Amino acid sequence: MSTKDFIEKDYYKVLGVPKDATEAEIKKAYRKLARENHPDANKGNVKAEERFKEISEANDILGDPKKRKEYDEARALFGNGGFRPGPGAGGGGTFNFDLGDLFGGGAQGGGGQGGAGGFGGGLGDVFGGLFNRTGGGPGTGTRTQPRRGQDIESEVTLSFTEAIEGATVPLRMSSQAPCKACSGTGDKNGTPRVCPTCVGTGQVARGSGGGFSLTDPCPDCKGRGLIAEDPCEVCKGSGRAKSSRTMQVRIPAGVSDGQRIRLRGKGTPGERGGPAGDLYVVVHVKEHPVFGRRGDNLTVTVPVTYAEAALGGEVRVPTLGGPSVTLKLPAGTPNGRTMRARGKGAVRKDGTRGDLLVTVEVSVPKDLTGKARDALQAYREATADEDPRAELFQAAKGA
């Protein structure tokens, strides 16, 4: 892949994701497209094969945080296939480079370029970092770009009922935010000066070649482009301070233990006008003394008497947060049989509910009254000729 292709190809468009997509979103988009265009699923389809290669190439760049950062930086500098510094560069001339010539090493600047010749280098140079024009006046620099805020992860513990029905819970978080004392400037008086080392760009050259240099964050201003004359006592001149806040978070119905919920734009505030990061809420769910959960279904174990199991009847069953339901118990119901109360389970994403799975547990009495004992004794005598274990022994012999 040539450097020209690297710069000009929009890999975000290839995968169909926004430029601020998370690693998880990029991975999900890649897997979906890779399945659809895989050569094994499209035998003889040349277009699908080319598309698969393009998708894999995009994932190789965007799926690697380091490569993605360098790709974004390179596109920001050579965005539309041409590099056009402002009039402050060198003698004030405008430079128009064709990417094909530029990365071939034969680009020449227009009038007033101030002694800059062509430069060599290919994809390896781009992966090394941003290119920055050397020579000329302060106008050659570009001010530090807006920076997206960091993502935050927090945890919340819900009761079993809250997880099933949904709940709004208070969430207290601590993060770095623009310092209120100095309005994020880092200067006590709110009037920082432009860093003389980087001339406000936030970057300094770390080596040159062919008239261009690779850049690093300025060590004097820490990449901010500004220096506090009188550092703020609260943030020590950084412009950022620890901030605590409490917000009400709506947890949707039907969440499960360990589920991660993403709230866009609720993370750390961005810098220099950049967007805020995201908030990820990890949900923990307490156990319920009666009910359990199996996917969208709830479970409950209901004890029944021997007579109810043998003769059949109606059994009342509790539900979560609602009135009880009555289930008809067929005669001869064995211990451990599961019955279903439809629509009494957990809430699904489409608003419908799963079922309540009711497991029958035959209760054996520990203390029998005289009449009950006599009745069971009579039952034993009446069924003395029956052997419930006969089939068991027969099967054991035949195995």
From Swiss-Prot:
GO BP: chaperone cofactor-dependent protein refolding; DNA replication; protein refolding; response to heat
Keyword Membrane on entry: no
Main location: cytoplasm
Keywords assigned: Chaperone, Cytoplasm, DNA replication, Metal-binding, Repeat, Stress response, Zinc, Zinc-finger
Domain note: The J domain is necessary and sufficient to stimulate DnaK ATPase activity. Zinc center 1 plays an important role in the autonomous, DnaK-independent chaperone activity of DnaJ. Zinc center 2 is essential for interaction with DnaK and for DnaJ activity.
PANTHER family named among the record's database cross-references: CHAPERONE PROTEIN DNAJ 1, DNAJ HOMOLOG 1, MITOCHONDRIAL-RELATED
Protein name: Chaperone protein DnaJ 1
Gene coding for it: dnaJ1
